[in-house]
Amino acid sequence: MNSNYLLLPHFDPSIFTLGDSNIGLRWYGLMYLLGFVFARWLAVRRANRPNSGWTVDQVDSLLFNGFMGVFIGGRVGDVFFYNLDHFLQEPLYLFRVWEGGMSFHGGLIGVIVAMIWTSYSQKRNFWQTADFVAPLIPFGLGLGRIGNFINLELWGRETNVPWAMIFPNDPLLLPRHPSQLYEAFLEGLVLFTILNIFIKKPRPMASVAGLFLIGYGVFRFIVEYVREPEVENFFGIITRGQALCLPMIIGGAFIMAWAYSRKSAVIK
């Protein structure tokens, strides 16, 4: 082991547990909770602006549905995108949430379903809902990646860059990219800043949602080059995460082009 690199301490992923059980509060869960608290604060702040088109009750309903979509979709996505073999051998693994992670792409699908339902129940245009939700997401994503870092999971590939870190649960104890922190910065702080500047300017409906898809897809695709793959690459060229990001980038670009072609639907 090279002593020139930072050796991280072995963080306990649990803040506390109840007795000898696996029930308790984990840092990863706390980060998700803080992300939703911040999202509600920001959403209520925007809803209280004149002519926002939203009430606080509608925001709370939207966020509750979104929370369920993230939790259910994220868990199901993690199982089916990354741990399908484990699930086929042991179907109850799907319900042991304390043993697995959360997939962003699965969570995104869950949020889309939640937005469709919320839009229908509130008799609202889906793209109005999607544009309202998109700027709320990145901050929570950034906190989630910090949770991954504390959990000492989803680390990067081996490297010799000066800021490389050695993760104590890595059997090889190799210096690696802290890819979780790269994602926290790009998918969290940078994407949050871009979207919240963009919504302050005149724009067509659906463009905010399209920009989110492009931004997340591009940032995640880039970081995947230095992130240790969880599963085999596709055709030895791209990772599973990159393959899942390509439809986001293409879909986001299509939505942006479609939105700007509808010149009569500019939001000021």
From Swiss-Prot:
Involved pathway(s): Protein modification; lipoprotein biosynthesis (diacylglyceryl transfer)
Keywords (A to Z) from UniProt: Cell inner membrane, Cell membrane, Membrane, Transferase, Transmembrane, Transmembrane helix
Domain of life according to the entry: Bacteria
The protein's Enzyme Commission number: 2.5.1.145
CC annotations in GO: plasma membrane
Subcellular location, principal: membrane
Pfam families: LGT (PF01790)
Transmembrane segments: 23-43, 62-82, 97-117, 132-152, 179-199, 206-226, 241-261
One annotated GO molecular function: phosphatidylglycerol-prolipoprotein diacylglyceryl transferase activity
Class of enzymatic activity (EC top level): transferase
UniProt-annotated binding residues for a 1,2-diacyl-sn-glycero-3-phospho-(1'-sn-glycerol): 145
Annotated disulfide bonds: none
Keyword Ubl conjugation: no
Family note: Belongs to the Lgt family.
Cited function: Catalyzes the transfer of the diacylglyceryl group from phosphatidylglycerol to the sulfhydryl group of the N-terminal cysteine of a prolipoprotein, the first step in the formation of mature lipoproteins.
Protein name (database record): Phosphatidylglycerol--prolipoprotein diacylglyceryl transferase
Organism: Haemophilus influenzae (strain ATCC 51907 / DSM 11121 / KW20 / Rd)
Lineage of the species this protein comes from: Bacteria, Pseudomonadati, Pseudomonadota, Gammaproteobacteria, Pasteurellales
